[in-house]
């Protein structure tokens, strides 16, 4: 019986090993959004605080939209005891001596400036001016924000413009000045809701976007309720105080957004400001950047040429 040629078998095995192609580890193909998603992770305390900060402007926005319900309202009036009139009478057909305002004559702009018999154009001018400002601001400020200002500065400037205009509204001397300032206020508030929602969804991973987005709407509801509470406490007083109370406190919150809110990392990447984008991701990430897996770290370097920036 012939014995197998051991040397020949070893030679064949060695040749087969040489012909076997090398196995290479291939990094998974990740888009820039997927890379950012992996870095941001889930939901942490830093992201929660950022969500609260960017939700405050929606609270202020709700107050400034609906403040006219109280400031521009028709106050109640009564007939004088010695006058021949009834509550169902047309106030415009009665002499001034036949009736009086129930509360202070400075409670609303109607009673202070004697607009009870003004035309429908004059009566609707403040509200129309406000929403005209919203229309103009929606077109112009969005362009400035995407190309030059950035989303953080846009949110800050929009909120500050709205609040400063609201503060100046308290010192209006007539309906024309009042309407002009309402137009500026509407111009400033136009991009606030969209900016806040974008910031909210960018701060967390996809799993939490539905829950975190509701914070903005909750803040908006709080703004409505707080405005009603302020108006109730201010009942009988001048409408000017209502603008002062809502604007002075709001200006401080607007300033906080400039110093404590991070810029959008996606916008920074689009502008080529890669190092700043990585610093932002490091600040808002729910997991330490050092503990990122190999694929995510390498992919971020390949996409944005950031080798040397990530520790």
Please tell me what each predicted stretch does.
Residues 170-180, 235-238:
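Helix-loop junctions at membrane interfaces in 12-TM secondary transporters
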Residues 2-10, 72-97, 211, 234-303:
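Central mid-sequence intracellular linker of multi-pass
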Residues 57-61, 132-134, 189-193, 204-258:
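Glycine-rich segments within core transmembrane alpha-helices of 12-TM secondary carriers
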Residues 2-94, 111-142, 146, 151-155, ...:
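Hydrophobic transmembrane alpha-helices of multi-pass solute transporters/permeases
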Residues 149-150, 171-176, 188, 205:
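Helix-breaking motifs and short loop linkers at transmembrane-helix boundaries and internal kinks
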Residues 105-106, 165, 177-190, 248-251:
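Hydrophobic core of transmembrane alpha-helices in multi-pass small-molecule transporters
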Residues 160-173, 228, 232-233:
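C-terminal ends and interior cores of transmembrane alpha-helices
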Residues 67-70, 140, 179, 191-196, ...:
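Transmembrane alpha-helix boundary/hinge residues in polytopic small-molecule transporters
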